[in-house]
Amino acid sequence: MDQNLESKGRVCVTGASGFLASWLIKRLLLSGYHVTGTVRDPGNQKKLAHLWRLEGAKERLRLVKADLVEKGSFDDAILGCHGVFHSASPVLKPSSDPKAYQCTQIEYCGVLCFATQKEILDPAIKGTLNVLRSCKKNPSLRRVVLTSSTSAVRVRAGDDFDPNIPLDESSWSSVELCEKLQIWYPLSKILAEKAAWEFCKANGIDLVSVLPTFVIGPSLPPDLCSTASDILGLLKGETEKFNWHGRMGYVHIDDVALCHILVYEHESAHGRYICNSTVLDNNELASLLCTRYPSLPIPERFEELERPHYDLSTSKLKSLGFKFKTIQEMFDDCIASLVERGHLSPL
């Protein structure tokens, strides 16, 4: 694919107002792309104002209505686009359904939420297929980049892998374990990604998937996403959610956006790509943060919980020349953003 600025084409980004999608659109616009973003309500000026403030937005950004669960609703957005970045995913939020399950297995999925199986699985799988069906109708399409998650790789029973061998893109999380523990978020990522691979293989669509770990960094949307809220809580001394993390991979939000663009543009990119800067135990993270930000009430240690030890290999992504920001840069940028928005007092 031609990477010259003057020949950048049009691409579509689903779920445009989200944490990752906003950063992806920012980077795409800075790279010279014309971007069509899909949102549920293009008229919601408050929710979308941050997108229109991005450099190049007034000249090269278009926002259109689309809904994951509506067949054909992505047709208009995707038609004429050379590339599609499918980053939209079901919104995790408290459920009024008395049958909703509280996912307390956060050591596996990294998300603490109340949600029913239907609220997460159906939109994730059907939504992905709806987007891909629209891609199939587009003769201009070159490549689709799907945002998956390392929760589609690392949810494994402790005796199911060798902790001394880093997990790589050939690894898949256990569907059976997810169903047994009723952890729907990682299950949705597994099933949606597998459905995407099957559909694209059957229909001749060039697909690449990106699997980020726990994403940290400045938030462009006005409301903090769940991961940013978790980080804010930790920096204020609220440890309940992080107590469950155990061992977790971390990556800068800007790196995740840049990774998506790299695997879209790089002709030889193929298959899955784990996007992760570092993997740390809770106490390793606590020690680092306490030393770097001594004025914040971050706990010096977390409760020791028995968790499977694992590491992640990023050699495939690094072979394309990718370099990750450090854990220190992630938190420096995140904290600066939280201070600027008034969520934290200046350090």
Regions found by a protein language model. Give the residues of each.
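Amphipathic terminal alpha-helices
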Residues: D2-N4, L30, I327-L347
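Alpha-helical substrate-binding/gating segment
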Residues: Q3-N4, I231-Y273
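N-terminal Rossmann NAD(P)H-binding glycine-rich loop of SDR-like oxidoreductase domains
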Residues: Q3-V35
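NAD(P)H-binding glycine-rich loop region in Rossmannoid oxidoreductase-like domains
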Residues: S22, D41-K126, N138
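Active-site "gating" loop of Rossmann-like NAD(P)-dependent oxidoreductase/epimerase domains
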Residues: Y108-V111, S149-Q182, K201, L220-P221, ...
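Active-site Tyr-X1-5-Lys
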Residues: K137, L177-V208
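Glycine/proline-rich active-site loop of Rossmann-fold NAD(P)-dependent oxidoreductases
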Residues: A202-D206, G217-I231, V263-Y273
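Mid/C-terminal beta-alpha module of Rossmann-like enzyme folds, strongest
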Residues: A257-R307, D311, C334-L338, G342-L347
